[in-house]
Regions:
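Glycan-recognition and catalytic cores of secretory/periplasmic carbohydrate-active enzymes
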Residues: 1-254
């Protein structure tokens, strides 16, 4: 709070050990993670002032995202695109705030993000959830448009399953989450060496990112969580086996 917010309310991405600002970015992911931290602190400590701060910052995030020109566009106007990342993280962010404090905007945001994932990012023709699509969800046949990020997709299935649990295991949400999880596991699991790899191309071309075949820790841990949620939702032994498979691999390597 003391060192990481600029005068415009946007967070710095990087500061020195003394709090001197070094870098700002065009995203609001730092704000989302700050909101989650404030919410969890409020729940753990009982200090409701942090729940109120979390809600206020969440509303600020929404204002940043809806104010034309406040956040620098990733692409020039020739490319009108939507990104999966912010759509997905807002589900979890709103969910964590809701656990600390009530406000109708939280349910509204979750519903809007869920609808956007279903409408724009799920592409059955590739059996994949894509990271970047056109403004109306159309497939963009470029290196970036073909990217599948199995970790992000599995994380999304976790968030949707968590919301399904909140809604007494809503069947439609469970169905959507399991579809994403099953597809993403198929794309991401390394059948030879185990673990979830970073990136795939939905047309099976070589993925552009240099780290495409690496296995960072976070896709593994999110797969551990998502598969356990899937088992809780369905009691299907398949998901328990997947949970054991990714858990064994993760704890053996990290």
């Amino acid at each position: 709070e003391k060192h990481c917010f600029d005068a415009d309310g946007h967070m710095y991405f990087e500061v020195t050990e003394n709090g001197t600002p070094l870098r700002k970015r065009r995203y609001v992911f730092s704000e989302c993670f700050a909101v989650i931290a404030m919410s969890e602190y409020a729940i753990a400590s009982g200090d409701k002032t942090y729940a109120e701060k979390a809600l206020a910052l969440f509303k600020r995030i929404q204002r940043f995202l809806s104010t034309p020109g406040f956040l620098e566009p990733k692409y020039l106007p020739a490319l009108q695109a939507r990104g999966h990342s912010i759509t997905m993280i807002l589900i979890n962010t709103a969910s964590r705030v809701r656990a600390a404090i009530s406000d109708p905007i939280l349910d509204t945001q979750i519903d809007e993000s869920l609808a956007a994932i279903r409408k724009y990012f799920i592409h059955p023709e590739f059996k994949a959830l894509l990271e970047m699509v056109g403004k109306d969800g159309e497939f963009i046949d470029t290196c970036n448009g073909r990217v599948i990020n199995p970790g992000h997709c599995i994380e999304t299935s976790w968030f949707i399953l968590e919301e399904a649990r909140y809604r007494d295991w809503d069947k439609d949400l469970v169905r959507t989450a399991l579809q994403i999880l099953d597809w993403s596991w198929e794309w991401g699991w390394d059948k030879e060496y185990g673990g979830i790899i970073n990136f795939r191309d939905c047309r099976n071309f070589p993925a552009q990112d240099y780290s495409q075949d690496m296995k960072f820790w976070w896709p593994q841990t999110e797969a551990v969580i998502a598969t356990l949620y899937a088992y809780q939702a369905t009691h299907d032994e398949k998901y328990l086996a997947m949970h054991k498979q990714i858990s064994d691999w993760t704890y053996a390597h990290f």
